[in-house]
Structures are given as structure tokens and as C-alpha cells.
Amino acid sequence: MKKIIFLLLIIPIIKYGQNNNSLKFNHQALLVNDLNQSGDFYNNILGFEEIEVGASQKPPKRWFKSDDGMEIHLISTKEKLKSIPKGVHMAFSVKNFDLFINNLKGNNITYGNWRGDENQIQLRNDGYKQIFFQDPQGYWIEVNNIK
């Protein structure tokens, strides 16, 4: 009987914690060797808005925000960074996939499908299109047309 009473008391607490304390994505921090080159890429190619850095500038940083409020924080480093496999990537959706592809082509940015075939678009089983490319530091980015 004591176990039943305990469960009846604790279930509302667990439910409250799940509903009112859920995680919300805030930002992705990336180490970069060339802060200007990487920052310009996220600003000019991906269209992220540069925002004020709300932290110390040691080490130097640049922060960016997407239209939906997702933030990318670039942090300068002198250490040599290891290459990252394509399976570890950030993914973004765009309304006009073809316009985005033309923007990449106009800026001489190579993209491809999951296998790595250059300038090839991946058509997923669910009908959505996706491409993969790398930022100047070598981080993998997926762009798709998921609504």
C-alpha cells in the first residue's frame, strides 16, 4: 500500500518536470581556425544574421542566428582540428531548394549526395531532396527541402 501511495505522489512530480522543464535547442558552437572566413561563410552563403557576442572575446568569437532563432557560435582556435565524418553534420531546411543550389553554384561551393557524387542531389525514400557540403573549416552541412 505504501508503494502505491508513493507512486501516486511521485507521478505528478515526474509529469511536471517533463512538461515544464523540457530542453530547447539554443546554439551550436564550432571551433574554427579562420574566424573571418568561416564567419563570412555563415553570413553570406547560408544567410545567417550576425548577432552581438554575449560573452568574453577571449578567445575571439562571432555569433550568428538563423531566421528561426537557431544560433551558431564560431570560436577561434589555433589548434589543428581533426576532420569530421559526414555522419556528424548539421541539417537545415530551405523553402526554395533550387534557389539555394544556384547560390552554392554561384559561389563555387561543391555539394553532393550522401555517397559524395559531386553536384548530385540525394532523393530520399520519403521524397525529400538533400545535399551535403562543407563549410571552410570542414564541418559537414546538410540542406534539404523538408517543410
Regions found by a protein language model. Name each.
Residues 30-71:
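Core segments of cupin and vicinal oxygen chelate
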Residues 33-36, 90-137:
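Vicinal oxygen chelate
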Residues 124, 144-147:
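Short beta->alpha transition motifs characteristic of CBS
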Residues 58, 86, 127:
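Exposed loop/turn and edge beta-strand positions of beta-sandwich/beta-sheet ligand-binding modules
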Residues 62-105:
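Mid-chain, structured segments of secreted extracytoplasmic proteins
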Residues 17-36, 88-92:
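N-terminal beta-strand motif that seeds the catalytic metal site of vicinal oxygen chelate
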Residues 1-21:
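Bacterial Sec-dependent N-terminal signal peptides
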